[in-house]
Amino acid sequence: MKKKLAFLTVLMFGLSLGLMACVTTSVKPTTANLKNPVIPLESMEVPQYDGYWYYSKGTKTVKGDPGDRGAFLPMSFLFSVQNPNPYPVLLEGIMFTVSFDEDFDVVTINNQDSYWIPAGKTTHVRTTTMITVRSALLSLLVTGGFKLKAKGWTSWDTLERWWKGVPDLTVPVKVKEGAFNFIASDIERVVAFEAQVK
């Protein structure tokens, strides 16, 4: 009986060492073996819609201060970040620009949240931003005026079309100049990104 107990103890100890050796021989991140994560844009939605409206500072208000104010247009982008590596990677920041009608940049998003993506897994990352009629108007007048003129569009007609068309995806929305910053151990990599909302 003592021989069996000693044999089982030695066998269990040997199996434990063997299994621990398998666990600790994982692949370490190197510049050569770090594969770029894959980043498809899953969806874009307008989580709250209050229509299209604008009033100037000359408008008499019932409550509150008069001013140049317009409707809000929140936009929420859902990305699937797929990690093809045999080790976890850290998504340390996201930056991208949102444009309407291909040519008109309306906002640049800079999200500094951190997300761990496990080895061989996919993590969903949501980034939300918001523009107003006023901010979009200023962008159109300052940086998009010549483009508007070339297309024969007016700023107010364009804004109304955007506010009514972006929520139901009848206005082209593009995510461009994207940069996703990944870290694996002490290796840092920026992955470029661009996508058309469908």
Tell what function each PLM region has.
Residues 82, 86-105:
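Short acidic, flexible loop segments centered on an aromatic residue
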Residues 31-55:
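Post-signal peptide N-terminal segment of mature Sec-exported envelope proteins
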Residues 133-198:
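Terminal connector regions
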Residues 48-74, 82-89, 116-118:
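Short, solvent-exposed beta-strand/turn "edge" segments of beta-rich domains on protein surfaces
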Residues 71-77, 170, 174:
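Short, solvent-exposed loop/turn segments enriched in Ser/Thr/Gly
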Residues 101-147:
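Intrinsically disordered, low-complexity Pro/Gly/Ser/Thr-rich segments with frequent PxxP/GP/PP motifs
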Residues 1-22:
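Sec-dependent bacterial lipoprotein signal peptides
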Residues 17-39:
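Bacterial Sec signal peptide processing site at the extreme N-terminus
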